[in-house]
Amino acid sequence: MQVKRVKVFKIRNETEAVEDDFVAEEEPLEVRTCYDDCQTFAIIMRTPGNDKELVLGFLYSEGAIDTIDDVSSVSIKGDNVVEVRLNKPLKVKVREMIVNSSCGVCGRAFLYTLNILKCNTRVSRDVIFSLPEKLKENQEVFKITGGLHAAALFTTSGELNYLYEDVGRHNAVDKLIGRLLLERKIPASNYIMQVSGRLGYEIVSKGIKAGIPIICGISAPTSLAVDIAEEAGVTLIGFLRGNSFNIYTHKERVI
C-alpha cells in the first residue's frame, strides 16, 4: 500500500472541520548485498512498491553493479528488506548512512558514457510539449495524495513506456533505471526521461549513466547538471510547462 489514511483539521477561512485525508507512505528499506556473506549496503527512505527495481537502479547508479549479469538473485526478505546476491565481490564501499528520499550524495560513482555523444536521437517540439500532461495523467498515487514525485520513460513519438512514483524523486529515477536493467535496455539511447521535479546533478547523472539522451523536467536545472549534460552530449530541457520550455544543452536533438 502506497497511501495511508489520516485525520486532518481542515481550515477554511473562519471554519474548521475534521476530515479524512491520504498521505504517501514513507518507510525505510534495508539493502543487503551478498557475495561470500551478506552486509547492509544502505538504508533507503522510500515509498513501498517496486522495491526490486529501486534496489537494482540504486546499485547501478552507485557503481556497485554494471549490468544485470552481475546479479545472481534478488530476494524480498519481509516488508522492508531486499537481499541482492552478487556474482562477484562488491566494487564500492558499503554506505555508512541512511539515504533519505531526497538524497544528497546520490550517484557518487557516476561516470558519463561517451557513446551518448554518437546518439542520433531526435524528437519534435510537439512531443516534448505533450510530456508533462501525460506524466500527470498517469500519476495514480499523486492523484490521491499530492505527495509523490514521478519519473517516466517515453519513446521519441511520445508513447509512455514506464512510470514510477516515489516520495523521493531520486528513488523514482532509480526504479525506472532498475526496470531498464531488468529488460536489458541500457543504454536507453532511443528514449526520453521526464521527471516531475527540478533537474539536479544526481537526477541528471543517473539518466546519463543509463544512456538516456534527452532529459526533461518541469523545473530548473542546476549549474552542475547543465555542465555534465553538456559534457556527456545529453539534451537537457527544463521549465517544461504549457507551451514553453528551455533547452540548456544540445539543442540539435529537438526538431
UniProtKB/Swiss-Prot annotation:
GO terms for cellular component: cytoplasm. Keywords: Cytoplasm, Molybdenum cofactor biosynthesis. InterPro entries: Cytidine_deaminase-like, FdhD. GO terms for molecular function: sulfur carrier activity; sulfurtransferase activity. It holds the Pfam family FdhD-NarQ. This is Sulfur carrier protein FdhD. One of its GO terms (biological process) is Mo-molybdopterin cofactor biosynthetic process. Belongs to the FdhD family. It comes from the Archaea. Required for formate dehydrogenase (FDH) activity. Acts as a sulfur carrier protein that transfers sulfur from IscS to the molybdenum cofactor prior to its insertion into FDH. The active site is at C103. It comes from Sulfurisphaera tokodaii (strain DSM 16993 / JCM 10545 / NBRC 100140 / 7) (Sulfolobus tokodaii). It is found in: Cytoplasm.
